[in-house]
């Protein structure tokens, strides 16, 4: 079977194909077959096996010949995107050179997932290290965040020709491309290399596509198709596909036609949702700033407003460039409002930074008296909420020095102890074990041929630790192993984990009961990504049913009311930056969510999963879209909805084939004929324009009805 995605027959063909694959999956699950395909069927979830088969089947079409080059793997966070991609890399490594692109901090995640997959594939083997080394040698890792990423790609394989490219956290790549003002950035260079590559297969892994702006779809699907499938300029894309008045998709049917065959989605199925803990409704804590904090906040806003006016007009050139967001979008990024947002978390007159002194060091040198409710009402409110948690707690802030490090000082003052992994970690020692020795906990780090290093943790002390972008991967791995230990089920070893944006990526945590987001962000998908670190498939299986819940909190700084009303009318900012970011995020989230719904409707599994609104066309074998998007918008939609219904009809046999017909006065010649389509396993109407139609009428009228 071969399918081409630019064809009205593709949706019904893929539905029928996946049904066959699912039946095969169920058979292999129960079999004792030792073939690699059977092993993968037993190792993978059904939704993973569907994509594994469709992508690796040389007869099917995804990524084959002139068809699409790969898939956007849009699977809900915690559903095993890494395992799926590694499965395909193993199966296709004899044909394609696997290159894994991810932030450097996530490279060890792939190694851990690879070991997990090998154990699932070969449960009869006790020593998996040799197989791990053998398979690992086929892979090449490239750091998307490295300054020399281009050189790493050359070292990995010379070029991207003939490679299987796996990009983890792919939304970061899409954002990097549209945030680039020129072609010199890592992200833009990678885009150009992918567009020029020959015989390339691609897997983009993300749980949050279209998180910043629908325009992220442009580089994504251009790379997957290998051509300019979507318009490169922001305004042309918005004119074609975004209704700015209603803040919703425009010409959605035409956009769906272009995207079908390039998306895999898994996440809404009821049987899968049962495997996740329950996410309780978000608690939004609006925290009034203290008078001194608000005074410093207003001074910071004056500086930011002056900088904004000084730079006005500088983005006009950027607006006209291809693959670039307008300047107003760049303005909303991390380089603006940083002062006021950090002061919204913590403000102290005692904080001064000496020459050649790091901000984190200055925070560490502050006396205990600097950490009060007056300097940070937000953190004090958060600590009160944390004390109600029956289990481990995750805290997120975009800001490290004046966010996480300040929280750490508050925790230390409250009597918490910081767990420092480097006290136990040694080079070559990559196995972590926890066990109880009386009332104390022992963390052991050892290698098979080396000494064991032990860290004794008193059960009387409550601990916290941090994961930021600067932490070593071995420290990150140890923290994750200790957190996920059965001995930490209620936070006995690590009660609180503080993470930054970079630190949070790729974490797979168990048992978490609360998530605290210290400041809002105008990209609500980031909040979802943070929550997904502990809301994962099977993450709470060890807990009783009543404890399988996660409570998220979001903290928003609001104006000090007494000072606000003392400011002359007209000079007041009606909303704080926190409030503006939160409201902007909700507005953008509405539009982005609508486009993510379109991605779900275009997913190759949509009809198989029984979702509503799936793109399903009558299989007329016509082109689904015109290559020129502007002309495509003017043409009639070739996708005529496929409607399945039971009808009463008569059977006839013509030239050895069976057909059915109805007498129908509403049709010009008085008959409707149907023929069997083996691909969709259903009867479809024969159009009057088909030469067979007239032959069948003559056959019926000749009185040869069976």
Swiss-Prot record:
GO terms for molecular function: ATP binding; hydrolase activity; RNA helicase activity. Pfam families: Helicase_C, SNF2-rel_dom. Induction: Expressed in the late phase of the viral replicative cycle. The keyword ATP-binding applies. A motif (DEAH box) lies at residues 168-171. Its main location: virion. GO terms for biological process: DNA repair; DNA-templated transcription termination; replication fork processing. One of its GO terms (cellular component) is virion component. Keywords: ATP-binding, Helicase, Hydrolase, Late protein, Nucleotide-binding, Transcription, Transcription regulation, Transcription termination, Virion. Residues 378-599 form the Helicase C-terminal domain. ATP binds at residues 75-82. Residues 62-227 form the Helicase ATP-binding domain. InterPro entries: Helicase_ATP-bd (IPR014001), Helicase_C-like (IPR001650), P-loop_NTPase (IPR027417), SNF2-like_sf (IPR038718), SNF2_N (IPR000330). The keyword Transcription regulation applies. It is found in: Virion. SUPFAM superfamilies: P-loop containing nucleoside triphosphate hydrolases. Its EC number is 3.6.4.-. Putative DNA-dependent ATPase required for providing the needed energy to achieve the termination of early transcripts. Part of the viral DNA-directed RNA polymerase that consists of 8 polII-like subunits (RPB1, RPB2, RPB3, RPB5, RPB6, RPB7, RPB9, RPB10), a capping enzyme and a termination factor. Belongs to the DEAD box helicase family. DEAH subfamily. This is Termination factor NPH-I homolog. It comes from African swine fever virus (strain Badajoz 1971 Vero-adapted) (Ba71V). The lineage of its organism: Viruses, Varidnaviria, Bamfordvirae, Nucleocytoviricota, Pokkesviricetes.
């Amino acid at each position: 079977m071969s399918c081409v995605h630019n064809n009205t027959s593709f949706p019904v063909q893929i539905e029928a194909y996946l049904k066959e694959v699912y039946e095969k999956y169920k058979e292999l699950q129960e079999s004792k077959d030792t073939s690699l395909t059977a092993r993968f069927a037993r190792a993978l979830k059904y939704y993973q096996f569907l994509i594994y088969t469709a992508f690796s089947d040389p007869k099917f079409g995804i990524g084959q010949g002139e068809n699409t080059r790969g898939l956007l793997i849009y699977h809900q966070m915690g559903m095993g995107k890494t395992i799926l991609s590694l499965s395909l890399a193993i199966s296709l490594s004899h044909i394609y050179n696997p290159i894994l692109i991810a932030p450097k901090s996530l490279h060890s995640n792939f190694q851990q997932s690879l070991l997990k997959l090998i154990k699932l594939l070969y449960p009869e083997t006790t020593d998996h290290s040799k197989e791990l080394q053998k398979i690992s040698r086929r892979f090449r890792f490239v750091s998307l965040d490295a300054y020399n990423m281009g050189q790493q790609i050359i070292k990995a394989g010379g070029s991207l020709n003939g490679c299987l490219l796996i990009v983890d956290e792919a939304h970061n790549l899409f954002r990097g491309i549209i945030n680039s003002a020129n072609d010199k950035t890592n992200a833009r260079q990678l885009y150009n290399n992918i567009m020029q590559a020959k015989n390339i297969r691609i897997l983009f892994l993300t749980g949050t596509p279209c998180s910043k702006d629908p325009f992220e779809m442009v580089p994504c699907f251009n790379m997957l198709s290998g051509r300019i499938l979507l318009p490169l300029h922001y305004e042309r894309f918005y004119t074609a596909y975004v209704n700015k008045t209603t803040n919703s998709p425009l010409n959605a049917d035409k956009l769906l036609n272009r995207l079908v065959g390039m998306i895999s989605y898994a996440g809404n199925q009821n049987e899968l949702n049962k495997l996740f803990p329950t996410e309780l409704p978000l608690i939004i804590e609006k925290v009034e700033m203290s008078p001194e904090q608000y005074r410093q906040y207003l001074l910071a806003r004056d500086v930011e407003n002056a900088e904004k006016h000084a730079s006005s007009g500088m983005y006009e050139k950027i607006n006209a460039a291809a693959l670039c967001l307008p300047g107003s979008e760049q303005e909303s990024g991390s380089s603006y409002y940083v002062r006021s947002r950090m002061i919204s978390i913590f403000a102290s007159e005692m904080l001064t930074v000496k020459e050649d002194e790091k901000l984190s060091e200055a925070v560490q040198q502050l006396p205990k008296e600097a950490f009060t409710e007056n300097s940070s009402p937000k953190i004090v409110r958060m600590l009160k909420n944390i004390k109600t948690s029956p289990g481990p707690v995750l805290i997120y802030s975009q800001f490290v020095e004046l966010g996480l490090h300040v929280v750490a000082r508050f925790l230390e003052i409250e009597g918490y102890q910081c767990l420092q992994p480097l006290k136990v970690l040694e080079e070559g020692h990559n196995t972590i074990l926890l066990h109880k020795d009386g009332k104390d906990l022992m963390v052991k780090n050892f290698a098979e041929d080396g000494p064991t290093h032990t860290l004794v943790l008193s059960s009387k002390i409550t601990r916290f630790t941090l994961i930021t972008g600067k932490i070593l991967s071995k420290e990150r791995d140890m923290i994750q192993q200790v957190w996920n230990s059965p001995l930490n089920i209620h936070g006995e070893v690590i009660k609180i984990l503080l993470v930054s944006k970079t630190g949070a990526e790729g974490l797979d945590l168990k048992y978490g009961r609360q998530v605290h987001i210290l400041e809002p962000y105008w990209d609500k998908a980031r909040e979802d990504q943070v929550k997904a670190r502990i809301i994962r498939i099977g993450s709470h299986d060890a807990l009783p049913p009543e404890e399988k819940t996660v409570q998220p909190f979001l903290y928003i700084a609001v104006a000090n009311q007494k000072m606000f009303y003392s400011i002359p009318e007209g000079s007041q900012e009606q909303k704080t930056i926190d409030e503006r970011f939160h409201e902007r995020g909700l507005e953008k989230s509405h539009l982005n969510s609508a486009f993510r719904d379109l991605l779900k409707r275009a997913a190759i599994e949509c009809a198989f999963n029984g979702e509503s609104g799936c793109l399903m066309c009558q299989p007329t074998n016509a082109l689904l879209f015109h290559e020129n998007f502007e002309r495509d918008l003017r043409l009639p939609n070739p996708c005529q909805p496929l409607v399945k219904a039971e009808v009463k009809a008569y059977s006839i046999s013509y030239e050895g084939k069976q057909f059915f017909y109805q007498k129908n006065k509403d049709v010009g010649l008085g008959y409707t004929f149907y023929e069997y389509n083996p691909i969709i396993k259903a009867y479809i109407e024969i159009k009057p324009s088909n030469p067979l139609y007239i032959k069948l009428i003559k056959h019926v009228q000749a009185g040869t009805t069976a």
